[in-house]
Amino acid sequence: MKKIVSMLVIVLISASISSLIAQDNTQLGLDIAKAQEENRKQLISYSWQRSVKAFSNGEEKNHSLVKVWFNTEGKMESSVLSSESSVKQQRGVRGRAQQNAGEDLLGLVGNALNLSIKYVFLSKGYWIDLLDEAEVKVEDGLVKIDAKDLLAKGDEVHYIIDSSTNLFKSINISSVVDGKPFTSSIDFKTMSDGTNHPSHTEIVIPSESIKITSENIDYIKQQ
């Protein structure tokens, strides 16, 4: 009888601890979602430039400068300011084939970048579900979150968040775009007014031997 009672006590204690952890993670998800939403409201008042470099087999092939801003609906838009390529353009049929291949590759890179951005701007519902399922550690002033199958089946994402502000320090992603595996790492900085923003992004698509680096610079607050 004593053994049964002891087992029941252990089960009840374990259940209570699990319940408390679930409640804590749910609240953490709400806190992070709130901080991220408030930060987004600050970020949409800025425009900036994005310096993008494309490397193939370790050699720089293209360098573009892009202006980025949010429209009146809060959606991110961009416009190419300049673009320099070291790839020699061929003529005739080969030239057209080269152009088509380049456009396909550009589309692939764009899709990988757009998917990476989605991991930055998650909705409150995603944050709550994420914290319910993910492995979460809070240590040394940081919240570390490891999750799988977040936005796509088989993806893996690792968030590091400042526990004092609930804003990002870094995000590392492993996912698939257009059927091709890729990795993406995003580092964040905080401006003098407290606005948190992606500062450096690196995307690698191994099957295409491509690496893309992106630096966000020259943030200007819109009037």
PLM feature spans:
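Bacterial N-terminal signal peptides
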Residues: 8-16
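Solvent-exposed N-terminal domain segments of exported/luminal and surface proteins
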Residues: 39-93
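Generic beta-strand hydrophobic packing signal
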Residues: 46, 51, 79, 134, ...
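Gly/Pro-enriched, hydrophobic low-complexity segments
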Residues: 140-223
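Short, exposed beta-strand/loop patches in secreted or surface proteins that constitute
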Residues: 67-69, 128-138, 159, 188-190
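Bacterial N-terminal signal peptides that target proteins for export
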Residues: 1-8
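Flexible, processing/modification-adjacent segments and terminal tails
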Residues: 24, 82-155, 175-178
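N-terminal leader/targeting segments and the immediate start of mature chains
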Residues: 19-49
